[in-house]
């Protein structure tokens, strides 16, 4: 059962402002330097502020307390949930465990587990329940439009290099989780598990505004690679397709340059041809 109110949560010792630390490996100074010549200064300012202070998820409406039941899949795969929570807490991206709710407006959504293509399972937070009163219901999708790169975009780039163009791919790992959320919105991303309470502090999958918000950072990386480092690429969210001339080391050099830039900015990557 999902989205059932379990009663008004009772706060215990509250989370202090001093505990509201932003968690992201992304290096503000590197982005500031690399984006210094970007023409859209307001956008750059927003991006840098997001790295320093976290991004707003765009929720409109009151932050009211609510507790939702976890999905059946969570009880069917408890080790998955426990392991994922422990990993995220250790990484500093999830706060907890708390014996009592950490904020008066704490709102928990249902935890669940879903299978991945590699046969493993992954933890999810069901932010679209309860219907009509969920976190996602409070985020207007028209405020967060996203336009993905298409196959035609990739074909156009490849065609510029002609027959025999060399392709490679660089993936940003745990990409959404690199983007921190502003502390004012942490109470919207609550979880409860085995009698304890947790709060997410980084972009989760399933949040309505997450693809748009993450893509702003991916677009920044794309601009940096193309403008400052002469890397020819097209990206679809966290996947970057890099193209080089046939019979030359351009593609390999571009991959290495991409990995160097990502390392300086502190993106986690996996690259392969």
Language model: regions and residue ranges:
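Short, conserved secondary-structure transition motifs
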Residues: 159, 163-165, 177, 243-246, ...
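Short amphipathic helix-turn segment from helical bundle oligomerization domains
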Residues: 66, 202, 242-245
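Short, flexible/disordered secondary-structure transition segments
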Residues: 96, 228-232, 251, 268-273
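Active-site palm subdomain of RNA-directed nucleic acid polymerases
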Residues: 211-259
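Short amphipathic alpha-helices and their capping/turn residues within compact interaction modules
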Residues: 90-93, 116, 223-226, 230, ...
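Catalytic-core region of right-hand nucleic acid polymerases
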Residues: 72, 80-215, 261-264
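Reverse-transcribing Pol proteins
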Residues: 1-142, 235-237
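Histidine/cysteine- and/or acidic
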Residues: 153, 255-273
